[in-house]
Structure formats: C-alpha cells, structure tokens
UniProtKB/Swiss-Prot annotation:
Ca(2+) binds at residues 15, 17, 19, 21, 26. Keywords: Calcium, Metal-binding, Muscle protein, Repeat. One of its GO terms (molecular function) is calcium ion binding. This is Troponin C, skeletal muscle. It comes from the Eukaryota. GO terms for cellular component: myosin II complex. The keyword Cytoplasm does not apply.
Length: 52
C-alpha cells in the first residue's frame, strides 16, 4: 500500500490541469505508472469511492 504522502505526491504530479481533481484517465495513469495493473472497472470504483 502507498502512504497518504505518496498518494498526495502522485496527485500533484498527475493533476495535469491543476483543477484539484483527477479524472478517471489521470487516475488510471497514476496507478499504472506505479506498476499496478488495473481495469477500467476498478478505476470506476475508485472514482466513486473518491467522490465521497
């Protein structure tokens, strides 16, 4: 698992349009760049969880 600090760092790097939000495409890129394999369905679940 990643620490919250690592995730925050990822967020800053991948929030390309700097709007404070990461879209599904950006999130998929983050996760895949960390070496994890993730499906589009998993990304959708993460996006739903992240909206809370």
């Amino acid at each position: 698992g990643k620490s919250e600090e690592e995730l925050a760092e990822f967020f800053r790097i991948f929030d390309k349009n700097a709007d404070g939000y990461i879209d599904a495409e950006e999130l998929a890129e983050i996760i895949r760049s960390s070496g994890e394999h993730v499906t589009d369905e998993e990304i959708e679940e993460l996006m739903k969880d992240g909206d809370k």
